[in-house]
């Protein structure tokens, strides 16, 4: 379930910018699926077996627009109404607005909150993910979920070669995870995927904030889809 198309978080590495997704508008120009709550209710009303409903895989459910449109909240209300479970992935502490609904879903079925943590360094975070709350704010959101007995999972991704692939960064994030009592950590290796559309944007941001880094990527990985290293930098 993806309620929006496009994103305003501005993450420099975002795979969803890729041309393979055939987005016909600017990535920051958000397409809104305004009838999503109606379609969701129709589908859940007819479903004979309960299951987990997932959201956040392609577009964050807590974009800036959500503050006014409240599409995500309306869908959570429907999920809670029909007794279904929820798995929700976000980078935003706006999820705290809906903690009351998340608690009710957890009480009646199952609710798992997944949150992406990329870098322990707050200054670096504001470059890599400029228009969303920082890692420390996300850690605070995880702590709130812990206090409400809502299980959490962290996506430790992506690990960008030469940027956040340090032992210090990984230890910092793992300490956050341990302290917040997360139930699982997902990591897809030491690297990032780049393809047409997102590669060009990523390289432009490297030129802007990390002069010379693009050339280091080109020397190390060429045009490879997977840009990964086998070792962290100490």
Label the model's feature ranges.
Residues 45, 110-114, 138-148, 208-216:
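Short, composition-biased local secondary-structure segments
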Residues 69-70, 103-115, 164-180, 206-209:
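Short, electropositive alpha-helical surface patch
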Residues 232-234:
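Conserved small/polar residues in nucleotide/adenosyl-binding loops
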């Amino acid at each position: 379930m993806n309620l929006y198309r496009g994103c305003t978080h501005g993450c420099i590495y975002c795979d969803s910018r890729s041309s393979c997704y055939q987005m016909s508008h600017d990535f920051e120009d958000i397409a809104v699926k305004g009838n999503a709550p109606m379609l969701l209710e129709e589908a859940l009303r007819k479903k004979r077996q309960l299951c987990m409903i997932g959201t956040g895989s392609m577009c964050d459910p807590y974009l800036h627009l959500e503050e006014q449109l409240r599409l995500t909240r309306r869908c959570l209300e429907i999920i809670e109404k029909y007794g279904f479970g929820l798995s929700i992935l976000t980078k935003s502490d706006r999820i705290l607005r809906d903690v009351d609904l998340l608690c009710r879903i957890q009480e009646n079925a199952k609710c798992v909150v997944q949150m992406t943590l990329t870098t322990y360094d707050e200054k670096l975070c504001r470059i890599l993910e400029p228009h969303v709350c920082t890692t420390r704010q996300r850690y605070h959101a995880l702590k709130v979920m812990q206090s409400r007995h809502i299980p959490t999972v962290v996506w430790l991704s992506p690990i960008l070669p030469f940027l956040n692939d340090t032992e210090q960064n990984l230890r910092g994030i793992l300490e956050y995870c341990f302290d917040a009592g997360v139930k699982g950590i997902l990591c897809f290796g030491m690297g990032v995927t780049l393809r047409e559309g997102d590669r060009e944007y990523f390289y432009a941001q490297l030129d802007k904030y990390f002069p010379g880094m693009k050339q280091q990527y080109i020397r190390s990985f060429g045009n490879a889809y997977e840009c990964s290293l086998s070792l962290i930098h100490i």
